[in-house]
Curated annotation (Swiss-Prot):
One function term, GO molecular function aspect: DNA binding
Protein name, UniProt field: Putative 3-methyladenine DNA glycosylase
HAMAP family cross-referenced by the UniProt entry: 3MGH
Xref: InterPro entries: Formyl_transferase-like_C_sf (IPR011034), MPG (IPR003180), MPG_sf (IPR036995)
Keywords: DNA damage, DNA repair, Hydrolase
Family per similarity comment: Belongs to the DNA glycosylase MPG family.
One Pfam family in the UniProt entry: Pur_DNA_glyco
Domain of life: Bacteria
BP GO terms, sorted: base-excision repair
EC number(s) given by UniProt: 3.2.2.-
SUPFAM superfamilies: FMT C-terminal domain-like
Amino acid sequence: MILNREFYKRDALEVAKGLLGKILVREIDGVILRGKIVETEAYIGSIDKASHAYNGRRTERTEPLFKEGGIAYVYFIYGLYHCFNVISGENDDGQGVLIRALEPLDNFDYISLKRFNKKFEELSTVKKRDLTNGPSKLCMAFEIDKKDNYKVLYEKGDLYIEDSCDNYDITQTTRIGIDYAEEAIDFPWRFYIKDNKYISKK
């Protein structure tokens, strides 16, 4: 069952925790890819110097952050990579959740060929973990890029998120790669499924 619209109309911290264990579904040329969300980070623009929307900063790039929760926000970094975020909250809240890592669930050869031009069985143990254990890696594996910006995630299409009833132990800690963010460096707004081998960093 697809997560409904109301799921996303909450605080980014709630959504970030709630997304753990949920299933990201991607359809590419008739192939269905599914990945369990195992690591997330919350960003709350009004108080968060790590957020693209800090202090109400509103540009063409950050506009998705100010929409109602339940759409995709995809941005480009370092001129090379994409990052996939889920918008949370109400209109004008400036909140979102970065999807940091997935555990691939099926079509392993398809994903492996996308990432490393090899079949899954040909990959080393390290390379198998590297398929989707980071925000840009999962975007490459699932072909998520700027064309997916603003996509609605609570309706069936080529990118959406399904519910899951499984329960997990969750670790809460600080976020990664935000050394510029002053006091926000210490906000414990990263969440991951404990002991999952696909998380980007403990």
